[in-house]
Regions:
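N-terminal subdomain of nucleotide-sugar transferases
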Residues: 1-58, 240
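A short helix/loop element that forms part of the nucleotide-sugar donor recognition site in Leloir-type
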Residues: 49-51, 200-212
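Membrane-proximal helix-turn-helix segments that form the acceptor-binding/catalytic region
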Residues: 110-113, 117-121, 148-168
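Carbohydrate-associated surface elements
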Residues: 171-174, 191-194
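Conserved donor-binding/catalytic core segment of Leloir-type glycosyltransferases
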Residues: 209-228, 233-237, 249
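Nucleotide-sugar-dependent
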Residues: 228, 279-288, 293-314, 319-332
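Nucleotide-activated donor-binding/catalytic signature segment of Leloir-type glycosyltransferases, i.e.
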Residues: 251-252, 257-284
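A short, well-ordered alpha-helix in the C-terminal region of glycosyltransferases
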Residues: 357, 364-378
Length: 395
């Protein structure tokens, strides 16, 4: 059985959570006996199609403009052309029996036309791994005006993407509730995020490199954007200034990088360090060295996301500290397993008190970290996810 995996972000050139998760899924499917081809954009290539192999996974990179540009018009333009550029690059590689199933990831919402063409040619089913409800989160955050032409534009492609899916997997029960209010006719179910459960051996490379040998490291790794409300975590770092061995380390890329850099300087935060994105292998080494995993979701969100970065924390038995939008079902899930301290965004004093408790009590850090690993094994196992998706596809 040959499966096509379609995503706008992939290793090794990108290290965002979606790229890591899809590669882990691809590797798991391969271990189960499937042939896997990942179809994804390439951003610095001259050829229309470049083929590559990573960990036995075949990768077809089609020529594309930059998707993560700060210029939002340029970004939207290039995303709109994703399907057209992909089809132009790969159509001569395809026959009626090339693929027996398609698994595609959203965001982006612009792969609907490509999925439709492949489904028609290969007569195969498709499964949509739906993570962020775009453009809804942009409307919630005020980045897109409700009922504007730009909303209607994105909504058209959003629905077109959903129309191509035989099955749609969302992150949580709350997200299904929100989704079905607007789109009631699709075949939806809960599909958690996932992770390979093999931890990385502990190292001290980054502690030595950054002169953090004796520090309690509060770590944030991943997308640094408006949806994460990064100022929320920088305020936490400011509140922890009196604790001399507490250090905040931010690693990643996104629209809010300049904001956190400015706030570090403005507030003279000598307990905070930012470094740009690093490779997946280096990221795993760094995760093995930190003490507390941070995350944040903007309070304006109406959807209820499960940040993929939490999986990396749980693999390494790192206790989790974060804040979410109101009624997010992460709170009861983490409370059930005792895997960390999660508060509603805006409860700054509670967040700070939890940060202090984790700083002062190593035993609590160890206990919460072990509980997080148990949560991972129960809810987010990549083997379970792979088997579930292939069962839905009937392959």
């Amino acid at each position: 059985m040959h499966l096509a995996l379609i995503i706008d972000d992939y290793l090794p050139h990108r290290t965002r959570v979606g790229a890591k998760m899809f590669h882990e899924l691809a590797c798991e499917l391969y271990s189960l006996g499937y042939q896997i081809t990942v179809i994804t954009p390439g951003f610095s290539q001259k050829e229309y199609l470049v083929k590559d192999v990573i960990d036995n996974i075949s990768i077809w990179r089609f020529k594309s403009g930059e998707l993560k540009a700060h210029n939002k018009f340029k970004r939207a333009f290039n995303e709109t052309l994703l399907s057209a550029r992909a089809w132009k690059a790969i159509k001569n590689q395809l026959k009626y029996n090339t693929f027996q199933g398609i698994i595609y990831y959203s965001p982006s919402v612009f792969f609907g036309p490509l999925v439709k063409k492949i489904k028609k040619l290969c007569n195969c089913p498709s499964y949509l791994v739906l993570r962020d409800l775009f453009p809804q989160w942009c409307i919630d955050s005020g980045l897109i005006r409700k009922n504007s032409l730009i909303e209607k534009y994105f909504r058209y492609f959003e629905k077109y993407s959903y129309d191509q899916a035989n099955h749609i997997g969302l992150m949580s029960e709350k997200n299904i509730e929100i989704f079905t209010k607007k789109y009631p006719l699709y075949n939806t179910h809960v599909l958690r995020n996932w992770a390979n459960q093999t931890p990385t051996e502990t190292s001290n490379i980054y502690r030595e490199k950054l002169n953090l040998q004796d520090k309690v490291i509060y770590f944030y790794g991943g997308n640094i954007g408006k949806a994460q409300d990064m100022k929320n975590l920088i305020k936490l770092a400011k509140g922890m200034m009196m604790y001399e061995n507490a250090h905040f380390l931010f690693v990643g890329q996104g629209d809010e990088v300049n904001l956190i850099k400015k706030l570090i300087v403005k507030w003279n935060l000598n307990n905070t360090t930012y470094i740009p994105s690093i490779t997946q292998s280096e990221f795993k080494k760094l995760l093995s060295e930190v003490d507390i995993g941070l995350f944040s979701l903007a309070k304006e969100h109406s959807s209820h996301n499960f940040p993929g970065k939490l999986l990396g924390y749980m693999v390494q038995s790192i206790p989790i500290l974060g804040s979410v939008n109101k009624d997010n079902d992460l709170i009861p899930l983490f409370n059930k397993f005792g895997a960390g301290f999660i508060h509603i965004n805006g409860e700054d004093e509670k967040l700070l008190n939890s940060a202090i408790e984790l700083y002062l009590n190593k035993n609590i850090r160890l206990q919460l970290g072990n509980n997080g690993l148990n949560l991972l094994k129960n809810e987010f196992d990549v083997t379970t996810i792979a088997n579930y998706i292939t069962k839905k596809l009937g392959v």
